[in-house]
Amino acid sequence: YGVETIHLHQVSADLKAVPHISVYLKDEIPERLHYKNNYRIKDLLLIADEGWSILDIHNPKPERYIGGTHGYDNELFSMHAIFIADGPAFKNGYSRDTFENIDIYPLISHLLQLTPNQKIDGDLDRISDFLLKKD
């Protein structure tokens, strides 16, 4: 790395002064994001604050935004998904707080009476409260 590392640290420091973004060098990426060690993640990560986007200034049509974003920090309530379920396995009219999407796989496996053939991070026990009965 050498000179490139010095420039990277300077760029990181400069970007940290920009409002409405979080800036992380690869080794600073929070573990809770689960991609710190992914080969697709490069040396610098920027995450926009909720309601903000990071855009290329070379947009050929600056009067309109012609892209999409990948969302924001997954701990933000606005990034949580909606889950609606109906059927004989579910309590009628039941509502609960948000839960992690990783728990949907064990739920679907349970409903289909399938046993996952590998270790998974999801856990049916964390979301079984909306089922009529637990086996």
Would you name each region that the model predicts?
Residues 1-95, 99-107:
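Active-site neighborhoods of enzymes that stabilize oxyanions during catalysis
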Residues 16, 20, 109-117, 132:
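Sec-exported extracytoplasmic/periplasmic mature domains
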Residues 104, 119-135:
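Long, internal low-complexity/basic segments
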